[in-house]
Amino acid sequence: MRSALLTALSAITFLSAQAQYGTFDPKAIATAKTTTTLIVLDAGDSPYNRTIQEAVKAHWKFTKSFDFITVNDLATAPMMPEKTYLLKTKKTDAEKHDGYFLTLVQGWKQKKGEVINVENNAVTNLPPAQELAFLMIDPATVSGTGAPMLNVYVKCMQDYLKQVESGKIKDKATADRIVDILEESFAAMEMVMLPREAELAAARAEGGGA
């Protein structure tokens, strides 16, 4: 669990360096709040599907309603302006390093012939203008020992949106303050989870590794 927490914290640090969190437009946030959010799940069953559904059902408050679809549905149904989408995206930087993100997207009217490309259950050609908020993730971690971090990601994303709408976040400088808040959240979670992890490890040892 400690490695999962450190991975998540490293992701937030990287995100700060990239200075990319999403929109700074309060009007875009206000419009998005009136939509229904479609939570895009992996194709087929996966640990990610189960954990993101649990996280959304427990913590999603940004829009009044949400529903679940699979990434395969993006290929058969066009994006809709009256919907927002919580999905995984993949970005590649100038040095050809790939990064995966949990991204909230404002739907739009696709142009004729415009196709949504998907790789490893993540959209690879999302128009940057449609991004409302995003956080870097490690797909393997959030599908394994770091699954509980999805709850934190969902909460932090909504906190960002709330602060943009209220005008507290207006640009890169004010957005960077989020990093301090997230670091405190991860530190607090680590204090709670690490003792529990030690207890479980001791129990497994006593039980012969079961």
Regions found by a protein language model. Name each.
Residues 1-25:
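Bacterial Sec-dependent N-terminal signal peptides
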Residues 74-140:
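Cofactor- and metal-binding active-site motifs of prokaryotic enzymes
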